[in-house]
Amino acid sequence: MSEIKTVGVIGAGVMGGGIAQSLAQAGYEVTCTDIASEALDTARQDAAEGRFGLAGAVARGKLDSSEADAARARITWSDSFEEAAQSDLIIECVPEKLDVKLSVFRSLDEAAPEHSILASNTSGFPIAAMAGATRRPDQVVGWHWASPAFVMKFAEIVVTEGTSDSTRDQVMACAKKCGKNPVAVRDNPLEWGFVANRIYFAMLREASRVVDEGVATHAEVNDLMVDCFRWPVGPFAMVKGAGSGWK
């Protein structure tokens, strides 16, 4: 089995920047790219000084300063798609629009070396659709991260019928090296979401019904679920926090 040494991240938004930081801290050489220079600047700043950035990790005793400096040096923030595409593993982190993701996968298939694994951080679009946009469906996989990427141990590794065992195993090993607890799950093209989001959104629909029926307010639902199930936040607070990167 080949070893992943370099990782490209396509998209420097809330998730892409955090994923790049996590990978760099795990020892990977990372190239993170975005078409928007402002997104790259924000991601670079967040990785260095943000709430879950390297400076904060040093202050909390999670890293020493030399480890933080080394991680910072392992990230290249670039506006070059082609540069990021020359990696052993490329993780797509563009907005949740299927047509955009398919376009990215077509471009990656053209630009990336033959051995490269192509992964998507989609929250729920079928991985089979993205695999079908390439000539290497056996090397396509989902790697669904949770926000904030650096903190959360969650990792859904989503495999299709065509994903090879080698691809799955390499990405699982990468996730473990990043300190995650990866679980390989099956792609289900007939449903949106894999495991965590299918269950979460079913719960969120019921929470919304409770509010719509006047049983409780949004805030009351949040408080009750925290107190009853010892969740860190309630279902409505989760939506807001995850979308903002918990800033």
Task: Please name every model-derived segment.
Residues 242-247:
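Long, compositionally biased
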Residues 117-187, 194-197:
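Rossmann-fold dinucleotide-binding core
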Residues 35-38, 42, 56-118, 125:
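Rossmann-like NAD(P)-binding element
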Residues 3, 36, 64, 164, ...:
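Helix N-cap / loop-to-helix initiation motif
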Residues 1-56, 111:
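NAD(P)+-binding Rossmann beta1-loop-alpha1 motif at the extreme N-terminus of oxidoreductases
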Residues 26-28, 136, 157-188, 203-231:
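Internal alpha-helical scaffold of NAD(P)-dependent oxidoreductase catalytic cores
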